[in-house]
């Protein structure tokens, strides 16, 4: 395993730069503790890139990302750029082209309820008390969002609209492998979500996932219909480890998983291609209303750095160290404003420094 890596850092807009500053602290602590050589280069993206370069994804940014082992992404967008045509706005003009350029076909969204944060979980107390730690693995480039034909035709009462759910065998195979490999780093359980009692695309999905599962005899596999899965997530989320989903089902379930954790400020996200190259970002937005106030929760950005170390750089030990430090900081009662309730809140900068210190101390 190489110990020399280069990361393209794209802080973006809103709270992006201030939470990214905390991720830098974490990477520095990881360098020192694990003797890993990690270098970084920073590039403009989103609204700030529009202001400086005239577009949300400059060619220099793309070229810099091509030279890196992974991308650590902040957040983009804000009211300042909402007057632009939709295709030119930061969100659509930056993230979607990056995903397409680097062929990022899989999205990984962890959702964990940390001890001490049960009060923020909207589920019943006895359910929240059990906790949960779920990884939603979503296929990003196939399915009904991209299938052809799609469109509208006709007039009057005969006007109709249509979309087409299409999945190729190779698309299902590669996302299934991501799910099973991820399960091996966790609790060795995959729940594949489909609607095989109605949809032909789901029949193929279930067949292919069942075939791929044979190569992972150490991983438990079970299948669940999407309607039942949405119910089971509310009834008992602790039953899930890795949830394997098509594009549209993953879109729905990953947001449901996010909501039951109680705070978007805790949720990282990873988008990967077949070579392990990935873009890592917080699941929340740029939060321009709190930008510059020093109150943003940096944990999602910090945990995104942990995912980067695990999935693109192959350093699961370093990723675990970050996650353990985050958990310990929360156990010790450290909270940013979004999680403080009636208690005392610490700043964005203080939270980053606290977690970095715990990494250095090896908690």
From Swiss-Prot:
**Subcellular location, principal:** cytoplasm
Pathway(s) of this molecule: Amino-acid biosynthesis; L-leucine biosynthesis; L-leucine from 3-methyl-2-oxobutanoate: step 3/4
> Residue numbers for the site described as Important for catalysis?
145, 195
Gene Ontology CC terms: cytosol
Taxonomic superkingdom: Bacteria
**Secretion signal, residue range per the UniProt entry:** none
Recite the UniProt keywords alphabetically.
Amino-acid biosynthesis, Branched-chain amino acid biosynthesis, Cytoplasm, Leucine biosynthesis, Magnesium, Manganese, Metal-binding, NAD, Oxidoreductase
- Provide the protein name: 3-isopropylmalate dehydrogenase
What species is given as this protein's source?
A: Photorhabdus laumondii subsp. laumondii (strain DSM 15139 / CIP 105565 / TT01) (Photorhabdus luminescens subsp. laumondii)
